[in-house]
From Swiss-Prot:
Function per UniProt: Binds 16S rRNA, required for the assembly of 30S particles and may also be responsible for determining the conformation of the 16S rRNA at the A site.
Protein name: Small ribosomal subunit protein uS14
Required cofactor names: Zn(2+)
Cofactor note: Binds 1 zinc ion per subunit.
Keywords, in A-Z order: Metal-binding, Ribonucleoprotein, Ribosomal protein, RNA-binding, rRNA-binding, Zinc
Gene3D superfamilies listed in its UniProt record: 30s Ribosomal Protein S14, Chain N
Residues binding Zn(2+), per UniProt: 24, 27, 40, 43
Subunit structure: Part of the 30S ribosomal subunit. Contacts proteins S3 and S10.
Amino acid sequence: MARKAMVVKQQRKQKYATREYTRCTICGRPHSVLKKFGICRICFRELAYKGQIPGVRKASW
């Protein structure tokens, strides 16, 4: 879990655009965040298996 201080720090508007980075809105994880959904791969997988993300299906070919 992300520390509360880091989550609050990330939410503030940065002085320079290059300092901004994505963070998972559910768990606060800073790495492997899917920009389209705003959540990390781990949370995405859990929600997709539960069917809580509309339009996402398990791939089969």
